[in-house]
Amino acid sequence: MKALLILGLLLLSVAVQGKTFKRCELAKTLKNLGLAGYKGVSLANWMCLAKGESNYNTQAKNYNPGSKSTDYGIFQINSKWWCNDGKTPKAVNGCGVSCSALLKDDITQAVACAKKIVSQQGITAWVAWKNKCRNRDLTSYVKGCGV
């Protein structure tokens, strides 16, 4: 009985961790979801952004005390402007999506929201892109992935 309880807890912890993509797996997924070259942003730039924001982890979540908002998912999409978490004051929900949807292993909704953000504000909407990706050689993010 004790072994079943421990097994159950282990399985629960695995389920809560979410998916951390391998580099080439994410590159292929983002390409298949139409991000390669979307609004002039290369796949390598999207990969660098995802690495800098979440380390390719779909469950990444970071609270911002100043704005009382939270960043969600692989692209760290903010609850003040882009998604609804039910607790951020004066949230806009520009993507019309629940923030919990941005934490799913299936990143289709996260990509759709990222497309909306980049369409309206450009890739510079993400601080991690400005700090870690802009004006850098990003070829290593897609090298050897066959994309």
From Swiss-Prot:
Q: Where are the transmembrane segments?
A: none
Question: Which cysteine pairs make disulfide bonds?
Answer: 24-145, 48-133, 83-99, 95-113
The keyword Zinc appears for this protein: no
Q: Could you name the active-site residues?
A: 53, 71
Q: Output the InterPro entries linked to this UniProt entry.
A: Glyco_hydro_22, Glyco_hydro_22_CS, Glyco_hydro_22_lys, Lysozyme-like_dom_sf
Record-listed E.C. numbers? 3.2.1.17
Kindly list the GO molecular function terms attached to this UniProt entry.
lysozyme activity
Look up the signal peptide feature and give its range.
1-18
Q: What Gene Ontology biological process does one annotation of this record name?
A: killing of cells of another organism
Pfam families named among the record's database cross-references: Lys
- Respond yes or no to whether keyword tRNA processing is given for this record: no
**Superkingdom:** Eukaryota
Q: In which tissues is it expressed?
A: Trachea.
Please report the stretch or stretches of sequence annotated as the C-type lysozyme domain.
19-147
Q: Which UniProt keywords apply?
A: Antimicrobial, Bacteriolytic enzyme, Disulfide bond, Glycosidase, Hydrolase, Signal
Its recorded reaction(s) are: Hydrolysis of (1->4)-beta-linkages between N-acetylmuramic acid and N-acetyl-D-glucosamine residues in a peptidoglycan and between N-acetyl-D-glucosamine residues in chitodextrins
| Quaternary data | Monomer.
- According to its UniProt record, which protein family does this protein belong to? Belongs to the glycosyl hydrolase 22 family.
The note filed under miscellaneous reads: Lysozyme C is capable of both hydrolysis and transglycosylation; it also shows a slight esterase activity. It acts rapidly on both peptide-substituted and unsubstituted peptidoglycan, and slowly on chitin oligosaccharides.
Task of the protein: Lysozymes have primarily a bacteriolytic function; those in tissues and body fluids are associated with the monocyte-macrophage system and enhance the activity of immunoagents.
Q: What is this protein called?
A: Lysozyme C, tracheal isozyme
Native organism: Bos taurus
